[in-house]
Regions:
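A short alpha/beta connector and helix-capping loop motif
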Residues: 57-76
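N-terminal accessory regions of nucleic-acid-interacting proteins
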Residues: 1-47, 118, 129
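Short acidic, Gly/Ser-rich segments with clustered Asp/Glu that frequently serve as metal-coordination loops
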Residues: 46-60
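Active-site acidic carboxylates
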Residues: 44, 62, 104
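Eukaryotic intrinsically disordered and solvent-exposed regulatory patches
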Residues: 34-35, 55, 91
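NAD-dependent ADP-ribosyltransferases
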Residues: 21, 43, 66-68, 100
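Short beta->alpha connector loops
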Residues: 30-31, 52-53, 83-87
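Active-site-proximal helix-loop-helix substrate-binding element of RNase H-like nuclease domains
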Residues: 4-19, 70, 75-82, 88, ...
Length: 165
């Protein structure tokens, strides 16, 4: 299959908008909802993976570490507010270290590096979409542009600069 190398903002603007069709749950403690989320994620063969950190807009501003760990299956997404949880619980670190569950994301190396600064785990079975698109001649690596080129949809990333702490 062949794809466009690049896409312009004007081309993206006319595409059909798209968003995650499943349920999204924000979790900030290790209660019943947390346990249900972990059980669901353990049953998945492939999950989506992303992290968010408090925005840093200048070099002199301190870096605060990962605030949010996002993991999703086909029909459910979980936003774990890891700062409020006192870090990443062991059960989530086990998922991140599992060879049995493929974790897919963009700029995965940076996200994993951010997690490893404060949490001990050995990341396994991660797939970085930004590294894969080069094989298809795609030069645009942002999630928004990859979605436009590969899926033909427009996605919004407006929430990515939110302060999840």
């Amino acid at each position: 299959m062949s794809y466009k190398i690049s896409v312009s903002p004007e081309e993206i603007e006319v595409l059909e908008p798209s968003s995650f069709p499943g349920k999204i749950k924000v979790i900030d403690s290790q209660g019943f909802e947390f346990m249900k989320a972990v059980a669901y994620l353990r049953r998945q063969k492939v999950i989506g993976f992303d992290t968010e950190s408090r925005p840093c807009f200048s070099a002199s501003q301190p870096h605060y570490g990962v605030s949010l760990l996002q993991l999703s299956g086909k029909d459910r997404a979980f936003l774990f507010r890891v700062k409020l949880m006192g870090g990443i619980p062991k059960s989530l670190r086990k998922i991140l270290a599992s060879n049995q569950i493929i974790k897919v994301g963009a700029a995965v190396t940076d996200d994993v590096r951010g997690l490893k600064k404060h949490h001990d785990f050995e990341p396994k079975a991660f797939v970085d979409l930004q590294k894969m698109v080069w094989e298809y001649g795609i030069k645009d690596k942002s999630v928004k542009k990859m979605a436009a080129i590969i899926l033909g949809v427009r996605i919004s990333k407006t929430q990515q600069l939110s302060n999840w702490e």
